[in-house]
Amino acid sequence: MADLLNVLKDKLSGKNVKIVLPEGEDERVLTAATQLQATDYVTPIVLGDETKVQSLAQKLDLDISNIELINPATSELKAELVQSFVERRKGKATEEQAQELLNNVNYFGTMLVYAGKADGLVSGAAHSTGDTVRPALQIIKTKPGVSRTSGIFFMIKGDVQYIFGDCAINPELDSQGLAEIAVESAKSALSFGMDPKVAMLSFSTKGSAKSDDVTKVQEAVKLAQQKAEEEKLEAIIDGEFQFDAAIVPGVAEKKAPGAKLQGDANVFVFPSLEAGNIGYKIAQRLGGYDAVGPVLQGLNSPVNDLSRGCSIEDVYNLSIITAAQALQ
């Protein structure tokens, strides 16, 4: 974990990337904000009621005098953001509805990112995943050519680092969706200094089993390879693989001779949200890997979701990762 963060901090040094932390009334978030403010790579923008945030800072003995603190209900930016929101939603929200929605810290914070007044957002310490992701999907939206966002985890143990996806967002995936996730995961790997070798997982290796689920992954492999070639993406994408064939060279040699990947994958695309979510938790709980995420990919600007059980360190680390995404 330290290795990844050190690489990112080096990239971010002197950049002062603006990251919105909507949950300024949460002590973990406010503490992390003061730690980030002391760096030259992330400048936090904290949202919340001034009186409550200042009272919390006093209670925690935190100096927030240099932190930008915005109350969505009273901010002079609100009128501008309301108009921008109404235009963005194209008839799906009246000005009155927008006024009400932008009292919500996640909607207000997301609008700061959309309006270019911030570079990214980290929320979820006191909100559900839906509360964090919904405004991003409505306002920031997905990149051109990408139909969905997805959630990856960095799985880290010592100097070993993998990416698992999708582990957080999409309960229903077709071949096109899996292909998009494979390509976006490869791009994420590149942006974090990895050489992406993407294995698309199944209970079958190179046609060893037959079912509709296997066919879906096989079709996804072809689509992902085609998309990567069109975009001149420097990545290897291959499959379908059982997990052992994707990660153990000796098994790959027996099960998938001649495959582009020979047990050296570092990015794993699971065939379903069930498999991805279970898989990362097994690696975390039984394998002893640190799970960093979910890191959302596919959006026009970075928005990331914390667990409500997060620590101060989690808020700090995810803010650094979000800032690094903003530089892509």
Swiss-Prot record:
Entries under InterPro entries matching the protein: P_Ac_Bu_trans, P_AcTrfase, P_AcTrfase_dom1, P_AcTrfase_dom2, Phos_Acetyltrans/Butyryltrans, PTA_PTB
Enzyme class: transferase
Record key words, sorted: Acyltransferase, Cytoplasm, Transferase
Catalysed reaction, written as an equation: acetyl-CoA + phosphate = acetyl phosphate + CoA
Gene Ontology biological-process annotations: acetyl-CoA biosynthetic process
Keyword Glycoprotein attached: no
Pathway membership: Metabolic intermediate biosynthesis; acetyl-CoA biosynthesis; acetyl-CoA from acetate: step 2/2
GO annotation, cellular component aspect: cytoplasm
EC number: 2.3.1.8
Keyword Cytoplasm: yes
Protein location: Cytoplasm
GO MF term set: phosphate acetyltransferase activity
UniProt-listed Pfam families: PTA_PTB
Principal cellular location given in the protein's record: cytoplasm
Family matches, as Gene3D superfamilies: 3.40.50.10950, Isocitrate/Isopropylmalate dehydrogenase-like
Record family assignment: Belongs to the phosphate acetyltransferase and butyryltransferase family.
Name the record gives this protein: Phosphate acetyltransferase
Organism listed in the record: Staphylococcus aureus (strain MSSA476)
Name of the gene encoding the protein in the UniProt record: pta
